[in-house]
Amino acid sequence: MAQINENYLKLPGSYLFSEIARRVNEFKVQNPDADIIRLGIGDVTRPLAPVVVEAMKQAVEEMGRAETFRGYGPEQGYDFLIEKIIANDYAPRGVQLGMDEVFVSDGAKSDTANFQEIFGVDNIMAVTDPVYPVYVDSNVMAGRTGNYDTEKGQYGRIIYLPCTEEGDMKPELPTAPVDMIYLCFPNNPTGMTLTKEELKVWVDYARENKAIILFDSAYEAFIREEGVPRSIYEVEGAREVAVEFRSFSKTAGFTGTRCAYTVVPKDIMIYDSTGEGHSLNKLWLRRQTTKFNGVSYPVQAGAAAVYTEEGKKQIQATIDYYMENARIIREGLQEAGFKVFGGVNAPYIWMKTPGTMGSWEFFDKLMTEAHVVGTPGAGFGANGEGFFRLTAFGTRENTEKAIERIKARMK
């Protein structure tokens, strides 16, 4: 008799965005003429940059000729892309990385979910609350989180770090020792950021406690303000304790193309039961070479084109487009009387629901009355209740239309 990994039974009934899709589809069946505007899941709407498309075309043509055909590529990524990543994303900020410290992958979602495999199941993990669900769910699957408390909306062995309105949506250090710390800045879902000084507090904590920070930096390209670090490695000592995840998905429109990278400095040590230290970099390389065959050559060629002079201009134009959407959403919600966070250094706007209205209740009201779909804060954790996320990744026309509807129908 085949038996399941019973940790899967501890997961919520459906993934957050699957539940949203179910409710939207049900509403559309009942209201086929409704013009639904989706500002929920963080998928992009702008096409790939022309320079990226051209690079991918050329790469595909190479794959069609025997003399330039490429089979299995290096699991860690092609050197031509890794060199550009280091030279453009890190060196200008004074961060020195080795070629073997960057791992190209098919997405930050899969990397943030898979990285926990290296850690023992007895490690204590900490997450901000609200939080991107993948961090929690992947650890539930591994058996690291304990059982789910339906009353609290939390797992028994996770240390939750509340991000509250009173605390400006920024987490405080854990009061109990932890081994794994998930941080995402600019933050999904709140859109908030940390200063270099605030981030240093976390790095210092990790160094003192031999903890490891799993730092999701997927939205760094959207940072607008001075003084906000683009990489955790801008903080002294971070190379000893932090893994950084980045993605081309939102930056360059690769949500359907799939390319990202993870930085694992060779300075980071992880310990066995005897206290002996082992290289986290080597363990991740071992994991990747066993379970991953690398990102396709045409996709990596497209990603490398992002770093050309023309590529940088085209990508920046797309980022500017989305951040103008963010401004429209943020200012429109404020005009309508809503309390909002984010939308300045990130493409997410985190709004407080009216009065004591629950976030799923607000979801249904917004969909039925304004025909606008967002993401209920409760889907990101217990401390997300009473809040709601809108994204700036829609088209300009739909973004403006959605805000006008909210201002007219949701006061």
Swiss-Prot record:
Its cofactor is pyridoxal 5'-phosphate. CDD domains: AAT_like (cd00609). Substrate binds at residues 15, 42, 109, 132, 188, 293, 389. It catalyses: (2S,6S)-2,6-diaminopimelate + 2-oxoglutarate = (S)-2,3,4,5-tetrahydrodipicolinate + L-glutamate + H2O + H(+). The keyword Transferase applies. Keywords: Aminotransferase, Pyridoxal phosphate, Transferase. The modification N6-(pyridoxal phosphate)lysine is found at residue 250. One of its GO terms (biological process) is lysine biosynthetic process via diaminopimelate, diaminopimelate-aminotransferase pathway. Pfam families: Aminotran_1_2 (PF00155). Signal peptide: none annotated. Its EC number is 2.6.1.83. Pathway: Amino-acid biosynthesis; L-lysine biosynthesis via DAP pathway; LL-2,6-diaminopimelate from (S)-tetrahydrodipicolinate (aminotransferase route): step 1/1. HAMAP family: DapL_aminotrans_1 (MF_01642). Belongs to the class-I pyridoxal-phosphate-dependent aminotransferase family. LL-diaminopimelate aminotransferase subfamily. This is LL-diaminopimelate aminotransferase.
